[in-house]
Amino acid sequence: MAISAVTNDQAVGRMLNEILDSNGNYTEFQFRRVIGEIAKVPGHVRKQMLYTMLYAAVGELREAKNQAAHISLSEGTAAEFLAAAAYHAANMLTEASRYIRRVPVEAIVALEASGFALLNAQGTFSFELMELLMNKTNAHAGNKEQFGGSLAFAKMLKSHGIPEDHVRSYVEECLAAVSPWYEGKGKSVVTGHTVDDVEKKAIVDIYLPAEPEEFGDIMVALSS
């Protein structure tokens, strides 16, 4: 049986997942080890993407945004994919959406990267791209269960005449409001969206690791 070598990308991905799963309980050694592995990854854009994801994973949002800002797109379509992923990790949803929407749908299909693009479109509230991709790749039936909540969310926005970029801006404002509870604390925040059971309310979810006594202050920050 042949054993394939583990690439630097795979090693970094595994280490990043360990840090994310630790809920802030990672060691300085773990952090430095990831830094060292990223340095071995070929390609400037790929390096910057991984640095961005690392700093976002540990709640160092300013540094994550700084790393994302240094991404050069001279490498073409693949670089735009990576830039979108990096900006998404840094909670820069508008920038992430801009880059993922710059990749032609035909190129996404040719690269067999529709799954990656769909996840980025979903995470950055880029519903027009999501619907276009699902139609172009004939993937609507296969992905309906996974992306059904997003499609219902998009349908509700359309019915009320709410542009998707307004939603992105709103979510970014919410993330900025709660940043004191995770930025610099080794924690990361995740967003999601769906509709209620009777499809009368569009719901944006923000998953933030926090202590029970912090809940009240977080709710006040979100509502102000």
PLM regions: where:
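Short, non-transmembrane amphipathic alpha-helical segments
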Residues: 214-224
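Short edge beta-strands and adjacent turn/loop segments
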Residues: 180-202
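Helical scaffold of the NTase/Pol beta-like nucleotidyltransferase catalytic core
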Residues: 151-183
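Long, contiguous interaction/recruitment modules in multidomain scaffold/adaptor proteins
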Residues: 1-11
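A short interface-forming secondary-structure element
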Residues: 202-215
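Acidic, proline/glycine-rich low-complexity IDRs
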Residues: 1, 44-45, 223-224
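Alpha-helical protein-protein interaction scaffolds
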Residues: 11-12, 18-141
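N-terminal low-complexity, intrinsically disordered segments
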Residues: 130-164, 195-196
